[in-house]
Amino acid sequence: MVKPLPRLRLQGFNNLTKALSFNIYDVCYARTEEERQRYIEYIDEQYDADRLTQILTDVAEIIGANILNIARQDYDPQGASVTILISEEPVIDKKQAGKELISDAVVAHMDKSHITVHTYPETHPQEGIATFRADIDVATCGVISPLKALNYLIESLESDIVIMDYRVRGFTRDVKGRKHYIDHKINSIQQFLAKNVKSRYEMFDVNVYQENIFHTKMHLKDFDLDQYLFEERAKNLSFKERMKIETLLKREIEELFHGRNLSE
């Protein structure tokens, strides 16, 4: 739960911009080129523009935002994108109300508050590794907090590795003229994660408190080879094959988690 600071009486509107960014990875092993292609097709179907639109619509509802516009696109050969413009003010039908009644907040926020997702399925050309990456950004202006959607997004996608960044920018001014650069308490993104999520993931923080920048990386603690095999079961593989595949997968996870290639 996002705990606000003691209520401030503001001069005008709350102009703080809060942005939450996710990189979510699903890692898989597919033995043949045909299996890797089927994995790409499976992921592309599982996370097409329609499914992603539903996920982002749910996010808007969770954070208490109103949807202004939705743009979505599936790509050839694979991948999809969805962008939703949001506001914290109710949407007023122009046909039922004069233009002068349309909330200024709605108009002002159309280029600031948004939720976007882009997907990137890909495969290794030789080693059988296939990955799916989803980049998600939730940016809000005002009192709406994107942190409320943390757990839902992690649970909605096949999240082997999650890289999260949260930052607060701008300021809001109170009636005495004093500027406030953040309006809620936060020490780490981890404090907003549900217990069942935290119990499943190994987590690491890099935070710059004075700049209101918070960064958390996490990957699954438990490694179950069957969860990473596509169209195959570990029991059908020889011990040597299992060890080879497990080594490849753990290396891939480690490299994605740290964001750099490991030495041979």
UniProtKB/Swiss-Prot annotation:
Binds 1 pyruvoyl group covalently per subunit. Keywords: Autocatalytic cleavage, Decarboxylase, Lyase, Polyamine biosynthesis, Pyruvate, S-adenosyl-L-methionine, Schiff base, Spermidine biosynthesis, Zymogen. One of its GO terms (cellular component) is cytosol. It catalyses: S-adenosyl-L-methionine + H(+) = S-adenosyl 3-(methylsulfanyl)propylamine + CO2. The record marks K112, S113 as: Cleavage (non-hydrolytic). It is an enzyme of class 4 (lyase). The active site is at S113 (schiff-base intermediate with substrate), H118 (proton acceptor), C141 (proton donor). Its cofactor is pyruvate. Is synthesized initially as an inactive proenzyme. Formation of the active enzyme involves a self-maturation process in which the active site pyruvoyl group is generated from an internal serine residue via an autocatalytic post-translational modification. Two non-identical subunits are generated from the proenzyme in this reaction, and the pyruvate is formed at the N-terminus of the alpha chain, which is derived from the carboxyl end of the proenzyme. Its EC number is 4.1.1.50. Catalyzes the decarboxylation of S-adenosylmethionine to S-adenosylmethioninamine (dcAdoMet), the propylamine donor required for the synthesis of the polyamines spermine and spermidine from the diamine putrescine. Belongs to the prokaryotic AdoMetDC family. Type 2 subfamily. PANTHER family: S-ADENOSYLMETHIONINE DECARBOXYLASE PROENZYME. This is S-adenosylmethionine decarboxylase proenzyme. The lineage of its organism: Bacteria, Pseudomonadati, Pseudomonadota, Gammaproteobacteria, Lysobacterales.
